[in-house]
Regions:
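N-terminal amphipathic, basic helical "cap/leader" segment at the start of enzyme domains
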Residues: 1-89
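Small-aliphatic-rich amphipathic alpha-helix that forms the alpha element of a beta-alpha
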Residues: 35, 94, 100, 104-147
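Generic hydrophobic/packing signal
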Residues: 64, 68, 91, 96-102
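Short, electropositive alpha-helical surface patch
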Residues: 146-157
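C-terminal helix-cap and adjacent tail motif
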Residues: 5-9, 14, 157-184
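Short secondary-structure junction motifs
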Residues: 44-47, 128, 157
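Short loop segments at secondary-structure junctions
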Residues: 54-56, 99-101, 164-167
C-alpha cells in the first residue's frame, strides 16, 4: 500500500469496536519504534509513552470515571460507565506524554507538534498492521499526574486506545483541499 493510501485509510477505531485479540509485545515495540522516528526540532524528542496493560487498565478506568464525576457539571451515568469500561475493551492503552525541554530551547507548541507527529507515525503503522487506534483527550487530562508519576516538565496530552478489530471502517471523504489553500 502506498503511503498516501495508508493515510487515506487511517481511521479512529473506538474501543467498542475492538475484538479480544491481544497485541503482543513485539508489535507494541514496532508501533513505538515508528513513533520514535518523528521529526523534532533540535532533536528534543519530547514524546513519552506509558504503556497500560492488565490490571492497570482496570485502575485507569476507575480513575477516568472518578475524575469525570468530580469534574463534570452535567453528569451522565452512561458516560461514567463508558469511561470505566473503555480501557478494558482495549488490548493496550498508551498515555501520550510530552517531556518539555528543560532548557526551553524551542517553543512548547513545537514539542506538542513533535508528539503529534509521533502519534501519526504510530497510528499509520497500526493501520498498516490492521490495528485500530483512538486518541482521547478528556477535559481532565491535566490530572493524569494523579494516576501515574510524571517527571518534572512532563505532561500528559492524551490517551491512545489500541486494539485489533473485525469490521470494515467507513470511508471518509474530507472537504476539498482547494478550500484550505491560498497562494500568496
Amino acid at each position: 500500500m502506498s503511503i498516501l493510501d495508508l493515510i487515506k485509510t487511517r481511521r479512529s477505531i473506538f474501543p467498542e469496536q475492538f475484538n479480544r485479540k491481544e497485541i503482543d509485545d513485539e508489535t507494541i515495540d514496532i508501533l513505538l519504534e515508528s513513533a520514535n522516528w518523528a521529526p523534532t526540532h533540535k532533536k528534543t524528542e519530547p514524546w513519552r509513552f506509558k504503556i497500560i496493560r492488565g490490571d492497570s487498565k482496570v485502575r485507569l478506568g476507575e480513575f477516568l470515571a472518578r475524575k469525570y464525576k468530580e469534574n463534570t457539571v452535567k453528569f451522565s451515568e452512561y458516560k461514567f460507565k463508558k469511561l470505566l469500561k473503555k480501557p478494558m475493551l482495549s488490548s493496550v492503552v498508551l498515555l501520550i506524554c510530552m517531556q518539555r525541554d528543560h532548557n526551553e530551547s524551542i517553543p512548547e507548541w513545537e514539542e506538542i507538534a513533535a508528539v503529534s507527529m509521533a502519534i501519526q507515525n504510530l497510528w499509520l503503522t497500526a493501520t498498516d498492521l490492521n490495528i485500530g487506534g483512538y486518541w482521547s483527550s478528556p477535559s481532565f487530562i491535566n490530572k493524569m499526574n494523579e494516576f501515574t508519576k510524571l517527571n518534572s516538565g512532563e505532561r500528559c496530552l492524551g490517551i491512545f486506545y489500541l486494539g485489533y478489530y473485525d469490521k470494515k471502517t467507513n470511508e471518509r471523504v474530507p472537504g476539498s483541499i482547494k478550500n484550505k489553500v491560498s497562494i500568496i
